[in-house]
Curated annotation (Swiss-Prot):
Annotated positions binding [4Fe-4S] cluster: C22, C26, C29
Cofactor stoichiometry and binding remark: Binds 1 [4Fe-4S] cluster. The cluster is coordinated with 3 cysteines and an exchangeable S-adenosyl-L-methionine.
One biological process term in Gene Ontology: pyrroloquinoline quinone biosynthetic process
PANTHER family named among the record's database cross-references: PQQA PEPTIDE CYCLASE, RADICAL SAM DOMAIN PROTEIN
Species the sequence originates in: Methylobacterium nodulans (strain LMG 21967 / CNCM I-2342 / ORS 2060)
Gene: pqqE
Phylogenetic classification of the source organism: Bacteria, Pseudomonadati, Pseudomonadota, Alphaproteobacteria, Hyphomicrobiales
Name used for this protein in its record: PqqA peptide cyclase
Length: 379
């Protein structure tokens, strides 16, 4: 008897990377090393068509991101299109530059939610990490206005060696600013973070302590603040399901219109990414070679293929497998069943123990930095 092919579920969310332009230069940015220039960005009408196709496909949430999405002159128009289509819009912003000046217009256009990044709870450290002076004062003013308008506010804090001691202070900051949710997201080492890994990697003892702080705060602040925690892969026992599983829940549209299964997928050579300027979104979701490549479980090698967790973590991260093992189809080295797992943990311990961390290689458009070689490329 032939096996029945399961119906492909619709994606839940779409990450709309409207631009790679950003006033911050964070060394852990998940954007690609080769950033799209302004001249390559999709125009307003194309984004509106993409949003309409997303709604028809069944997408519920649109994450308006970048770079800094408010750098787009048409961000209000794009947000209004989301509202007109019944799409829940989430603005992922640095809160600096043009963000505050456009906030009320975004609110009037129907914006549903704001996610505001904080590089540090301390102004000087925030400037050092983000590479922008006077950023903190702009963020405070932006957060205050978001709450005054009645918009739900989530703070996002990417945690690494340079700010891991501030987790308690960042939790207090979220409460003080009136946020409903805080994301304590340990750095995921893709994009610029992979280049800066040795400068960003925290000690395992510090990671464990930060997790205990979050767990205590969750109990203490129950009903006041929801705290999400993303733990670092290099110290994990099992990998996370990348983007909820490759090609299962999310899709990412780049500023130039490429549609990716995850934001780092372009690091995998040989994948064919379809563009919204050439294909309808539904066609891309169902038939794009890039989405098909690692969707489901048939592509898996052992030990993933026979693992009881194969439909929980879906093999972990393909981009991380490539970066660390030299093979995108390999077991994610974050998994304890990977032959590289112990080596990767030892690498993290060694980098975190550096007495003086290397200088940051800041995110910039034009001229990608040198990329570390895969740990397992010659294994």
């Amino acid at each position: 008897m032939n096996a029945v092919t399961p119906t492909l579920p619709a994606p839940i969310g779409l990450l709309a990377e409207l631009t790679h332009r950003c006033p911050l230069r964070c060394p852990y940015c998940s954007n690609p090393l080769e950033l799209d220039k302004r001249s390559a960005e999709l125009d307003t009408a194309t984004w509106q068509r993409v949003l309409a196709e997303a709604a028809a496909l069944g997408v519920l949430h649109i994450h308006l991101s970048g770079g800094e999405p408010t750098a787009r002159q048409d961000i209000v128009e794009i947000t209004r299109t989301c509202a007109d289509l019944g799409l829940y819009s989430n603005l992922i912003t640095s809160g600096v530059g043009a963000a505050l000046g456009k906030l009320e217009a975004l609110y009037d256009a129907g914006l549903d939610h704001v996610q505001l990044s904080f590089q540090s709870a301390e102004a000087g450290n925030a400037e050092r990490i983000g590479g922008l002076k006077n950023a903190q004062a702009q963020k405070f003013a932006f957060a205050e206005r978001v709450v005054a308008l009645g918009l739900p506010l989530t703070l996002n804090a990417v945690i690494h060696r340079g700010n891991i001691d501030e987790v308690p202070t960042l939790i207090d900051l979220a409460v003080t600013l009136g946020a409903k949710r805080l994301e304590v997201a340990h750095t995921q080492y893709y994009g610029w973070a992979y280049v800066n890994r040795a400068a960003l990697m925290p000690a395992k003892a510090d990671v464990d302590r930060s997790i205990r702080v979050v767990e205590e705060a969750r109990e203490r602040l129950k009903g006041r603040l929801v705290i999400d925690l993303v733990v670092p892969d290099y110290y994990a026992k099992y990998p996370k399901a990348c983007a909820g599983g490759w090609g299962r829940r999310l899709m990412n549209v780049t500023p130039a219109g490429k549609v990716l299964p995850c934001h780092a997928a372009e690091t995998i050579p040989g994948l064919e990414f379809w563009n919204v300027q050439d294909h309808a979104l539904a066609d891309i979701w169902a038939h794009s070679p890039a989405f098909q490549a690692y969707r489901g479980t048939s592509w898996m090698k052992e030990p993933c293929r026979s693992c009881d967790r194969r439909e929980k973590d879906w093999g972990g991260c393909r981009c991380q497998a490539l970066a660390l093992a030299g093979d995108a189809a390999a077991t994610d080295p974050a998994c304890s069943l990977s032959p590289l797992h112990a080596k990767i943990q030892a690498l993290a311990i060694a980098e975190s123990a550096l007495e003086i961390a290397p200088d940051y290689q800041y995110r910039t458009i034009g001229g990608a930095p040198a990329v570390p070689q895969p740990e397992g490329a010659s294994a």
